[in-house]
């Protein structure tokens, strides 16, 4: 793999040559040479993601996007803020034996809830909330990114195939797949993100997606015994919260009680 590539998604590379900004695109062009490419032309998807970032605007817990940049005639990439510690999931897996302090992890959870609150205030659905789309910065501050599958409410329809990963997906609970409330889906996923941060492991880590889906369908969730913020996580999973603001307030109260 080319040296500047720091991430790889389904149809895009993320590369950085200066460790200050990153380029997300389906071709990596450097010094007039195409160093890597995906077969799928992602111009439309990148333009949509740029539009979502512009719609969201500036926020301390949203990854900053500088817009589309032509890297070669007719070839565009997204210029993004560079996350020095990568995504939260990768960081957790690389530091499995040395978790961050409980206080730092609670603040990471709060950052995530505040970012999602802003996303919802701007009437955007992320549609793929997970720790692999949370990015870690200096002092372990978190910003939400990767809006490739997101939509603006009232302007877009949810596309088939766009959904959360198994451990982050709200069970049907007697509903049709597409009839689950969008906010409840995202708040359930927020609960799983908080779990992953506080437990320092993803829900049912290492198990197959199908097995996780079966357990969730039966109402079986990972044990929360001994995990800080267990009540908040459980309430997210039980659909007890009406907004990310409520989750953020609960986390603030918990942080204050720990002092």
Language-model region placement:
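Conserved short submotifs of the Hanks-type protein kinase catalytic core
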Residues: 73-87
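Catalytic-loop of the protein kinase fold
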Residues: 116, 120-137
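Activation segment/activation loop of eukaryotic-type protein kinase catalytic domains
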Residues: 132-175
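Helical subdomain adjoining the active site within ATP-dependent kinase catalytic cores
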Residues: 2, 200-259
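AlphaC helix of the protein kinase catalytic domain
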Residues: 88-100
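Short beta-strand micro-motifs within the conserved protein kinase catalytic domain, predominantly
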Residues: 64-76
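ATP-binding glycine-rich loop module of kinase domains
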Residues: 2-55
């Amino acid at each position: 793999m080319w040296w500047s590539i720091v991430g790889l998604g389904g149809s895009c590379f993320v590369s950085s040559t200066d460790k200050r900004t990153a380029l997300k695109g389906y071709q990596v062009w450097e010094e007039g040479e195409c160093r890597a490419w995906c077969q799928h032309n992602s111009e439309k998807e990148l333009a949509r993601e740029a539009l979502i970032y512009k719609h969201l605007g500036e926020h301390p817990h949203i990854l900053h996007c500088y817009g589309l940049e032509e890297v070669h005639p007719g070839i565009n990439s997204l210029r993004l803020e560079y996350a020095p510690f990568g995504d939260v999931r990768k960081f957790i897996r690389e530091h499995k034996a040395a978790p961050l302090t409980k206080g730092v992890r609670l603040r990471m959870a709060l950052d995530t809830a505040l970012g999602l609150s802003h996303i919802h205030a701007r009437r955007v659905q992320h549609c793929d909330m997970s720790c692999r789309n949370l990015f870690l910065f200096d002092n372990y501050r978190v910003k939400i990114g990767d809006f490739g599958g997101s939509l603006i409410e009232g302007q877009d329809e949810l596309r088939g195939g766009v959904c959360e990963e198994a451990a982050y997906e709200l069970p049907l609970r007697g509903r049709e797949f597409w009839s689950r409330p969008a906010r409840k889906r995202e708040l359930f996923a927020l609960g799983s993100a908080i779990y992953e941060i506080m437990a320092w492991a993803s829900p049912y880590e290492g198990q197959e997606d199908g097995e996780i889906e079966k357990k969730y369908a039966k109402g079986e969730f990972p044990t929360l015994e001994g995990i800080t913020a267990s009540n908040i996580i459980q309430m997210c999973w039980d659909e007890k919260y009406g907004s990310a603001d409520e989750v953020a307030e609960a986390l603030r109260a918990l942080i204050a009680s720990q002092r």
